[in-house]
């Protein structure tokens, strides 16, 4: 099953899974992962000030289930949301339209070939993205390319080796259904990758199997 088809089949339940708002998705989140995705999302989004006034890329923007309320407050920002899935984009667009958010532009695209010039964005957000990107090294390179020197890269993604039940479920279910795409980083591998790009300007911590990070691009490329 391809990644596109997997997410198409999941669309009706995606937001329920991510937010744990149904009894079964609450059990999935709190018993299997032992992590509250809502709390993780809040922590990541708090890294971005409401009065941020620069250019921002959100990749993958997904359905905007976590970001819509935040973006409603960020009226001075110029936000671009990119996702490979047109179904995700349709849901996000409907959500932004209902919230009367006009300063977010949505585009279908591939994180490994971002349709933007180098040093274009002041901030890049990537929540729950890198564990679904097939070519993770290229994705990191593209994010680094389009980010301005001094710009911020923040977000979260799954890392292996922190919780056995979660790792088993990823290998046996999510990877096989195309909902996650291996290979996956360990915490050490993820930290090494971020530091290879951003040097000492890296802050990370993990909430069990979820890595939360904030990086600042050095003023001079390396």
Locate the predicted segments by residue.
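Conserved class I S-adenosyl-L-methionine
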Residues: 1-50, 65-69
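C-terminal alpha-helical "lid/dimerization" subdomain adjacent to the S-adenosyl-L-methionine
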Residues: 20, 28-29, 34, 154-213
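A short SAM/SAH-binding and catalytic strip from SAM-dependent methyltransferases
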Residues: 123-135
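Short glycine-centered segments of the SAM/dcSAM-binding site in methyltransferase folds
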Residues: 55, 150-152
């Amino acid at each position: 099953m391809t990644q596109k088809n997997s997410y198409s089949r999941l669309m009706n339940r995606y937001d329920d899974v991510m937010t744990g708002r149904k009894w079964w998705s609450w059990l999935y989140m709190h018993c299997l992962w032992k992590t509250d995705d809502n709390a993780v999302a809040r922590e990541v989004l708090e890294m971005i000030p409401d009065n941020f006034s620069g250019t921002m890329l959100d990749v993958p923007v997904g359905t905007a289930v976590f970001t819509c309320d935040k973006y409603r407050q960020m009226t001075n920002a110029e936000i671009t949301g990119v996702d490979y899935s047109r179904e995700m984009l349709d849901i996000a667009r409907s959500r932004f339209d209902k919230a009367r958010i006009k300063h977010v532009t949505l585009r279908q695209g591939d994180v490994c070939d971002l349709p933007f010039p180098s040093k274009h964005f002041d901030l890049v957000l990537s929540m729950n993205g890198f564990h679904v990107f097939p070519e993770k090294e290229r994705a990191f390179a593209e994010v680094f390319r389009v980010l301005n020197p001094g710009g911020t890269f923040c977000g979260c993604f799954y890392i292996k080796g922190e919780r056995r039940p979660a790792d088993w479920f990823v290998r046996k279910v999510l990877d096989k259904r195309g909902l996650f795409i291996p290979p996956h980083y360990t915490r050490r591998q993820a930290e090494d990758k971020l530091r290879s790009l951003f040097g000492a300007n890296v802050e990370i911590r993990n909430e069990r199997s979820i890595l939360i990070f904030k990086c600042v691009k050095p003023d001079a490329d390396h």
